[in-house]
Amino acid sequence: MLLGFKEYETQAQHLAEALGLPYAMVGVHRFPDGESKVTLPGRLPVHVVFCRSLDHPDDKLIQLLLAATTARKLGAQRLTLVAPYLCYMRQDTAFAVGEAVSQPIIGRFLAGLFDDVITVDPHLHRTHDFADAVPAAHVMALSANAAMAEFLHSYRAAHYESHADIILLGPDSESKQWVRSLAEANGLEYGVAHKQRLGDREILVTLPDLDLVANTVVVVDDVISSGETIAVTARACLERGAKSVDVLVTHPLFAQGAIERLRQAGVGEIWSTDSIPHPSNCIVLTNLIAEAVQRIV
């Protein structure tokens, strides 16, 4: 059985259909004081798959704790969590005395609830093995690169004037693995910008030595939250003579005001996977995730 939650119900239902599993939605009622009442089906099979993306995570983590614990009491012996976007992976070290390091804390929390944890492109910087971040019995960190490369190939063939005038650009060093993979899959030129934080809100982006004049630039990243880095990068590309700047992202967190910030910076198209529901979703991850779940069912 696959259990989903309302805000991610469409993707969860599609995954259940792809796996041939019965689907049910976890009931979540919010009380006026902010507490949650979680309700599961009264009878559960031995193996239960939970599907929920963990953007805006704090309430969701508590609800998963309640749901997973209740599932065990109802007879489930193996619990699998499919979280296409996995929260709290970005902080893997303390930058000040007394600062909580969220990655291992949340990783151990999830490993204590679920036997298997499956995610897509977790934002791991200094942690090289996903199992070190989430020490569950079985973990899988899938890559959306193939699906994104296929989308980019189809889109450029249908919409761009030629293939030769497209350049892929990573906004910082952490994006290099994604932009390089997409460029190699599509036979495109790519580069990686250098990002420097000058303060809490000021970012300096230095573009690589690429000829952007009259070229279409596609900025590629794994996560966009505030959009500030991408906005600064887009402005720099347009100032150097780029014909247009589009954006391709795996996880569209898009905090309040992010889309407006990107538009004001001159960004044209914005494409994302459906790891987090958003109007920019155009790359479906169902098949990628279903194949991973089938390997452990």
Predicted region positions:
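PRPP-associated nucleotide enzymes
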Residues: 1-297
